[in-house]
Design a protein with these regions (language model features):
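Acidic/histidine-enriched, beta-strand-rich ligand/metal-binding domains
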Residues: 1-84
Length: 84
């Protein structure tokens, strides 16, 4: 999995895990979130978006189950459930 610089005021980097269809977003604060069941075509759209921050706000935020990735010794913490 390769990280891509986001060139965005909204977040710093992003990556996509093909094997499990997961999007990873690293925010400028350093926090990393993993979004589950994220379609590859939407990752491609995010990469191509004129404004990745706007795409994130309109197409991703609040629409996917996600978790914050915290220190490995503590494990991930579920922070949102879309009810799926």
């Amino acid at each position: 999995m390769d990280w891509v610089l986001a060139d965005s005021r909204a977040f710093a980097e992003m990556a996509y895990g093909n094997s499990k269809c997961q999007l990873y977003i690293r925010f400028h604060s350093g926090k990393i979130y993993r979004y589950f069941d994220f379609p590859r075509h939407q990752y491609d759209e995010l990469l191509a978006a004129e404004s990745r921050g706007t795409y994130f706000a309109e197409q991703i935020r609040g629409k996917f189950l996600y978790e914050e990735i915290v220190e490995p010794r503590l494990g991930p913490r579920l922070v949102y459930s879309s009810g799926k």
